[in-house]
A protein has these predicted regions:
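Active-site recognition of the HExxH zinc-binding catalytic motif
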Residues: 108-121
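Acidic/histidine-rich, surface-exposed loop or edge segments in extracytoplasmic proteins
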Residues: 7-25, 84-95
């Protein structure tokens, strides 16, 4: 069987995004995710600094010892995302944040990867192994932030976590242990900051395995 030939698409009102996909089924989802992510991140004066190329693929991604549905590769400035139909068919990710994985959560997952791109556009001397915690904090906060208000309320209520507090250490270890709690704590912490810019700068200039909350 010959591989599908990818076509190229653009988001009508988001020139920073270009999409390569076998067909146009995922274009609306990607454009919606980009719009929501850029809107959320703009509140924190974070904007894309260069084009983001999104490639819709039909297989899982093997990344640093585990399988993923999406990733942003800063070296090539390309974002890879598994298509929603293929993802649902494989049953690889039946739930997201304790809820059945569906179109809304797919948009959130795409927004998560777009946030990695925007983070790397704005960060100083990005080295993934050293600033994963900072990137994931922002990516999960955005992923939760772009969901519908009702979905977000249900997730926060079900998890029962409060925001990160002064003295806490934000780490990918905690994220791996409790991704929903990590997302809830990150979203609540970020959105409740009276002046978020100093903390945003901590994230963008972060060079360690965990982030200490001031």
């Amino acid at each position: 069987m010959l591989p599908a030939v990818a076509d190229h698409y653009n988001c009508e009102e988001i020139p920073e995004i270009s999409i390569s996909a076998p067909d146009d089924k995922m274009v609306v989802h990607v454009c919606e995710a980009a719009d929501r992510a850029f809107t959320f991140l703009s509140r924190y004066e974070l904007h894309p600094q260069k084009p983001i190329s999104v490639e819709i693929i039909e297989k899982l991604i093997y990344l640093d010892g585990y399988w993923a549905i999406g990733m942003y590769d800063g070296s090539s400035e390309r974002l890879f995302m598994m298509s929603l139909p293929t993802l649902l068919e494989t049953g690889f990710l039946p739930e997201m944040y304790g809820q059945p994985f569906d179109e809304e959560h797919y948009i959130g997952a795409v927004a998560h990867e777009i946030t990695h791109a925007v983070f790397q556009h704005n960060a100083s001397d990005v080295e993934d192994k050293w600033n994963n915690a900072a990137q994931e904090y922002l990516a999960h906060a955005t992923q939760l932030g772009v969901l519908s208000a009702q979905r977000r309320k249900e997730i926060i209520s079900s998890e029962g976590s409060g925001p990160w507090e002064s003295g806490d250490e934000i780490s990918v270890t905690y994220m791996g242990f409790n991704p929903t709690g990590f997302a809830v704590k990150s979203y609540l912490h970020l959105t409740q900051l009276n002046d978020p810019q100093p903390f945003i700068q901590i994230l963008l200039n972060h060079k360690w395995l965990y982030v200490s909350v001031p």
